[in-house]
Amino acid sequence: MAAAAAAGPEMVRGQVFDVGPRYTNLSYIGEGAYGMVCSAYDNLNKVRVAIKKISPFEHQTYCQRTLREIKILLRFRHENIIGINDIIRAPTIEQMKDVYIVQDLMETDLYKLLKTQHLSNDHICYFLYQILRGLKYIHSANVLHRDLKPSNLLLNTTCDLKICDFGLARVADPDHDHTGFLTEYVATRWYRAPEIMLNSKGYTKSIDIWSVGCILAEMLSNRPIFPGKHYLDQLNHILGILGSPSQEDLNCIINLKARNYLLSLPHKNKVPWNRLFPNADSKALDLLDKMLTFNPHKRIEVEQALAHPYLEQYYDPSDEPIAEAPFKFDMELDDLPKEKLKELIFEETARFQPGYRS
């Protein structure tokens, strides 16, 4: 062990990866939003793992996302949600420039898979079931993921699926309009529910269901269903398929400017799903219709989606666990300076330090 440690940190593509002596034989996988991901050999458990290097401390937003992700993933425990196996960082806060998060190694993700393969109905059904099974747990903890998209769904060779990237996640709070909530909302536009763009009051779990609907549509056709180039284009893509919203649906849009914009548009008819996806299973299209519903109050919820006939071969409520307790952030992270967030990240990762006692 001492000899390995003395060899110093490994370099990957010009970046220091200081994870020895336990983790060796590093191999580049890709770049994350603010760090590199490598696979490595875990000499303790004798398996290959994924290690994400994060260097967030220069930016308040990156610190926030890192802390959210670590806090949530250390409390969640579910087969369809990526866990954290280990966290490596410097022994003192002054020395801590990077954080290394060790997770199970998953060979690919749904984004990469859909670029190269057309999925069978069986695969679509099984992947969708696992997404919803993981989402049931997330929502039972009163958390919104808020950034569900194909690249955040990790897959391995046995078709196990795990949801990752909780950096944008929030505690669900339907009564509270987060100040600045929209401004920092940077989730990928193509998977955003219409109410996010229309500034409806309070976001609910239904925003994640919309994203899952977009993902299902993409699995059926290997292309994004609403590939908007910008904010208004995104809305036009959605209305071009769903048709013009009814008066009842317009009433849930609080923002008058947004409502008037919708009223000013020429009337559009809904495009039948079987015209868009002529080869798709009719039950899959029925579930898709219930997920991609303009009005968030009429959108299907995760438990109902799991019980839908399309998923009946997998549906088993006794094997679809929920969180033991609702998740809470001790404080609103938005307003904290990066120095305070760094302290909180240091504390949150202490349990992985050698000789730690709680």
From Swiss-Prot:
What's an example Gene Ontology biological process for this entry?
negative regulation of cell differentiation
Give the cofactors, semicolon-separated.
Mg(2+)
This protein's major location comes to cytoplasm
- Write down which residues bear the modification named Phosphothreonine: T183, T188
- Activation/inhibition comment: Phosphorylated by MAP2K1/MEK1 and MAP2K2/MEK2 on Thr-183 and Tyr-185 in response to external stimuli like insulin or NGF. Both phosphorylations are required for activity. This phosphorylation causes dramatic conformational changes, which enable full activation and interaction of MAPK1/ERK2 with its substrates. Phosphorylation on Ser-27 by SGK1 results in its activation by enhancing its interaction with MAP2K1/MEK1 and MAP2K2/MEK2. Dephosphorylated and inactivated by DUSP1, DUSP3, DUSP6 and DUSP9. Inactivated by pyrimidylpyrrole inhibitors.
Matching entries from Pfam families are given as: Pkinase
Annotated Gene Ontology cellular components are:
axon; caveola; centrosome; cytoplasm; cytoskeleton; cytosol; dendrite cytoplasm; early endosome
Please report the stretch or stretches of sequence annotated as the Protein kinase domain: 23-311
Highest rank taxon of the organism: Eukaryota
What EC designation does it have?
2.7.11.24
Q: Where is the signal peptide?
A: none
Q: Which InterPro entries match?
A: Kinase-like_dom_sf, MAP_kinase, MAP_kinase_CS, MAPK_ERK1/2, Prot_kinase_dom, Protein_kinase_ATP_BS, Ser/Thr_kinase_AS
Q: Where in the cell is it found?
A: Cytoplasm, Cytoskeleton, Spindle; Nucleus; Cytoplasm, Cytoskeleton, Microtubule organizing center, Centrosome; Cytoplasm
Phosphotyrosine modification sites are: Y185
Kind of enzyme, top EC level?
transferase
Active site per the UniProt annotation: D147
| Quaternary assembly | Binds both upstream activators and downstream substrates in multimolecular complexes. Interacts with ADAM15, ARHGEF2, DAPK1 (via death domain), HSF4, IER3, IPO7, MKNK2, MORG1, NISCH, PEA15, SGK1, and isoform 1 of NEK2. Interacts (via phosphorylated form) with TPR (via C-terminal region and phosphorylated form); the interaction requires dimerization of MAPK1/ERK2 and increases following EGF stimulation. Interacts with MAP2K1. Interacts with DUSP6. Interacts with ARRB2.
- From the Swiss-Prot or TrEMBL record, give the protein name: Mitogen-activated protein kinase 1
**What does the record give as the organism's lineage?**
Eukaryota, Metazoa, Chordata, Craniata, Vertebrata
